[in-house]
Curated annotation (Swiss-Prot):
It comes from Streptococcus thermophilus (strain CNRZ 1066). PROSITE patterns: ADOMET_SYNTHASE_1, ADOMET_SYNTHASE_2. ATP binds at H16, D175, A176, K177, R242, F243, D251, R257, K258, A274, K278. This is S-adenosylmethionine synthase. Its EC number is 2.5.1.6. It catalyses: L-methionine + ATP + H2O = S-adenosyl-L-methionine + phosphate + diphosphate. Catalyzes the formation of S-adenosylmethionine (AdoMet) from methionine and ATP. The overall synthetic reaction is composed of two sequential steps, AdoMet formation and the subsequent tripolyphosphate hydrolysis which occurs prior to release of AdoMet from the enzyme.
Length: 397
C-alpha cells in the first residue's frame, strides 16, 4: 500500500481577537503612511471585553485620529452590537504611543555602510530596523503557489465572513476559526481533504443542526473543490456545541499572535517576527515579503516545485548577512545558481526592498486578515510574477 501523509493548517476570521488587534495596528499604520510615507511605526494593540489599548513607538510628522481609526476598523469587522461585549462606538480606546528610540533610529536612518564609508548610495542609507531571519515560500500545488491546507483554511473563514456580511446567514457573528487536514500521496501531491474543522460564533437562537447544515452546504462545499471531498472526509462543525460568546468578550487579543496563519500555515519555516503595525524599515515584515516574492517567481519560472528563501539581517546594517534558497530536491538547476541569480536580480537592502515593492504606501490593513501571502482578492506587490523571465535567463547564463 502506498504511503499517505496528512498535513494540517488553520486560519481565523477577521473577527478573531488576535486578528482584530492586527487590523487595528495596520489601520493605524496605513493612516500614518497616508500622510507621512517616511514614518517609522511600531504599533501594538491589545483588545479585551469593552477595551482597546494601543502602545508602541512612532516617528512621524502626521496627525492621526487614532480613536476614530480604531472605532471605524472595529465597525468594519462587524462588532456593532453591544450584546457582543465589544462594540465600535462603546469600547474604551486607550492610545499610548511614544517616539522611536533614538538609539534604534540612528541605525535605521543611517546604515553602518554609510557611517563607515560616507558613501551616499541612497539604497545603502537605511539600515535594518532589527536583527533577525525571515522566510518566504512558494509551492506549485495551488494556482496562487501556496500550500493547499492554509489556502483552503483562509478561503473557508473568508466565505463565512462574506455570508455574514451579506446577511445570507443572518445568525453568524464575527469570530470564527477553520482548520483543514489534507492527505498527500507518496509524491507529496495533495489527493483529498481528510478533515475540516470550523468553529463559528453565532446568535443564541441558532441550532447546531442548522449551523452544521449551512456551514457544510454554503461554506465547505462552496470553497473546497469536489474532487477533494469524499464519503470519508470528516466535518467537525462547532464541536463544543455552542459558540455564542466570542471575540474579545471570550478571549483577549494581541497583535502578532497569528504569525503562522499570516504566512504558510506551518508548511514552511518562520523566523518568528510578526508583521502587523510595522512599517517597511522593519525587516520582519518587508524582508518576509521580499522572500515570498523571490520564492514565488522561482516556482512560477519552473525552476523548482517548491522553494524556501531565507534572508537574515543585522540591526543598522543595510546588506543582508545571508541569503539562502532551499528547493527540497525539486530544483531543475543547481541551488547555487538560484542563489546567485537572486543576489543579482533582487536588491535585498531594506531601501531596495521598499523601492522594489513600493512599500511606503498605505496597503497593509488589507493584509491583516486572511493571510499576507497568496492573496488573489487584493493586489499585493510581493505576489507579482514579473521576475520569471529574468530568473530563467540568469540561471541559463
Amino acid at each position: 500500500m502506498s504511503e499517505r501523509k496528512l498535513f494540517t493548517s488553520e486560519s481565523v476570521s477577521e473577527g478573531h481577537p488576535d486578528k482584530i488587534a492586527d487590523q487595528i495596528s495596520d489601520a493605524i499604520l496605513d493612516a500614518i503612511l497616508a500622510e507621512d510615507p517616511d514614518a517609522h511605526v511600531a504599533a501594538e494593540t491589545a483588545v479585551y471585553t469593552g477595551s482597546v489599548h494601543i502602545f508602541g513607538e512612532v516617528s512621524t510628522t502626521a496627525y492621526v485620529d487614532i480613536n476614530r481609526v480604531v472605532r471605524d476598523t472595529i465597525a468594519e469587522i462587524g462588532y456593532n452590537n453591544a450584546e457582543y461585549g465589544f462594540a465600535a462606538e462603546s469600547v474604551g480606546v486607550h492610545p499610548s504611543l511614544i517616539e522611536q528610540s533614538p538609539d534604534i533610529a540612528q541605525g535605521v536612518n543611517e546604515s553602518l555602510e554609510v557611517r563607515g564609508t560616507g558613501d551616499q548610495d541612497s539604497l545603502d542609507l537605511i539600515g535594518a530596523g532589527d536583527q533577525g531571519l525571515m522566510f518566504g515560500f512558494a509551492i506549485d500545488e495551488t494556482p496562487e503557489f501556496m500550500p493547499l491546507p492554509v489556502s483552503l483554511s483562509h478561503k473557508l473563514v473568508k466565505k463565512l465572513a462574506d455570508l455574514r456580511k451579506s446577511g445570507e446567514i443572518s445568525y453568524l457573528r464575527p469570530d470564527a476559526k477553520s482548520q483543514v487536514t489534507v492527505e498527500y500521496d507518496e509524491n507529496d501531491q495533495p489527493v483529498r481533504v481528510d478533515t475540516v474543522v470550523i468553529s463559528t460564533q453565532h446568535d443564541p437562537e441558532a441550532t447546531n443542526d442548522q449551523i452544521r447544515h449551512d456551514v457544510i452546504e454554503k461554506v465547505i462545499k462552496a470553497v473546497i473543490p469536489a474532487e477533494y471531498l469524499d464519503e470519508d472526509t470528516k466535518f467537525f462543525i462547532n464541536p463544543t456545541g455552542r459558540f455564542v460568546i466570542g471575540g474579545p468578550q471570550g478571549d483577549s487579543g494581541l497583535t502578532g499572535r497569528k504569525i503562522i496563519v499570516d504566512t504558510y500555515g506551518g508548511y514552511s519555516r518562520h523566523g518568528g517576527g510578526a508583521f502587523s503595525g510595522k512599517d517597511a524599515t522593519k525587516v520582519d515584515r518587508s524582508a518576509s515579503y521580499a522572500a515570498r516574492y523571490i520564492a514565488k517567481n522561482i516556482v512560477a519560472a519552473g525552476l523548482a516545485r517548491k522553494a524556501e528563501v531565507q534572508l537574515a539581517y543585522a540591526i543598522g546594517v543595510a546588506n543582508p548577512v545571508s541569503v539562502r534558497v532551499d528547493t527540497f530536491g525539486t530544483a531543475t538547476v543547481a541551488e547555487r545558481k538560484l542563489e546567485s541569480a537572486v543576489r543579482d536580480l533582487f536588491d535585498l537592502r531594506p531601501a531596495g526592498i521598499i523601492q522594489m515593492l513600493d512599500l511606503k504606501r498605505p496597503i497593509y490593513r488589507q493584509t491583516a486578515a486572511y493571510g499576507h501571502m497568496g492573496r488573489t482578492d487584493v493586489d499585493l506587490p510581493w505576489e507579482k510574477l514579473d521576475k520569471v523571465d529574468a530568473l530563467k535567463a540568469a540561471v541559463e547564463a
